[in-house]
């Protein structure tokens, strides 16, 4: 019975409303933590996982040996690989596609690669103008890897102690 009486007086005096207004007023005059994104940017973690890239060896040969471990381990089924044997008997990829709409950027592909071929770069800002552009092909992945190889190698070397 006492609970009902207390609830009646709380609702009559609008105590819940006043408590909410007090909370709003209290936070109104505190410093803001909003970052105006395009002009200001937060520092990225060294382990940030962004856009994918395929790497090459220093002699120019692509690293991917078409083992398809990254395709098998991908929980979102975002990676599609086709391979063929070359004249020298080694396997190489003929098709390596990543659907960025499906990808959850978990990093399993990067961890499973035995030759460090597929990596996730620090690239955060990219866009698509048409629906089909969300599928990144092998030539595009190799071009990204070639363009950012120095930064990729530097980040991998800094993170090597933690792998």
From Swiss-Prot:
Q: Does the keyword NAD apply?
A: yes
Q: Which GO molecular function entries does the Swiss-Prot or TrEMBL record give? A: 4 iron, 4 sulfur cluster binding; iron ion binding; NADH:ubiquinone reductase (non-electrogenic) activity; quinone binding
4Fe-4S ferredoxin-type domain boundaries: 54-84, 94-123
Q: Where in the cell is it found?
A: Cell inner membrane
What's the domain of life for this entry?
Bacteria
**Cofactor binding note from Swiss-Prot or TrEMBL:** Binds 2 [4Fe-4S] clusters per subunit.
> Where [4Fe-4S] cluster 1 is bound, by residue?
64, 67, 70, 113
Write the protein's name. Answer: NADH-quinone oxidoreductase subunit I
Q: Which organism is it from?
A: Xylella fastidiosa (strain Temecula1 / ATCC 700964)
Starting at the broadest rank, the lineage of the source organism is: Bacteria, Pseudomonadati, Pseudomonadota, Gammaproteobacteria, Lysobacterales
